[in-house]
Amino acid sequence: HGAIRRGELQVLYQPIFDLDSRNCVGAEALLRWRRPDGTLTSPDLFIPMAENTGQIRQMTDFVLQRLLEQLGQLLRANPQLYISVNLAACDVMVPRIGQVMARLLALHRVAARQIAFEVTERGLIDVVVARENLQALRDVGHQVLIDDFGTGYCSLAYLQTLPVDCLKIDKAFIDALGHDAASSGVA
């Protein structure tokens, strides 16, 4: 919470390209913590800490607010673009994100379909509650993506029960394709 108050958190954007057209179709919003001395603290360190202390909700709100402040005008001018945002497990387990987004989208006049939400398999603690909250996000127009698929416990059969638009396969599996004998037959 102190990092937010001190202005040390920033949202960076990793572009997303369509491989066929080679056009940029959107970006993923990434939270970064830059210390006063200029060093970056790895999200692998500060995100779990924020989850354990209950401060992750403030960080999620910060990302949502900042991205719409920074990119709202761009999104309004380019309705085909979208930004994806990572949600923590606690964000998925309550309907609060839908309420926060409705207020921010109305304020910035951005369409719900232009903000996608990414959750990890590990974030789907209570599947019944997660399904209900993710479906509510989809019902108003948001896309739902599973990030780092393959690193958790979800099977494809389990995923069929969830309101998911896209699977993002974990990088470790993609990097091994064609190089590792065990994965060379994966198509």
Kindly give the residue locations of the regions a language model identified.
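Conserved long alpha-helical elements within nucleotide-processing catalytic cores of c-di-GMP signaling
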Residues: 47-48, 57, 135, 184
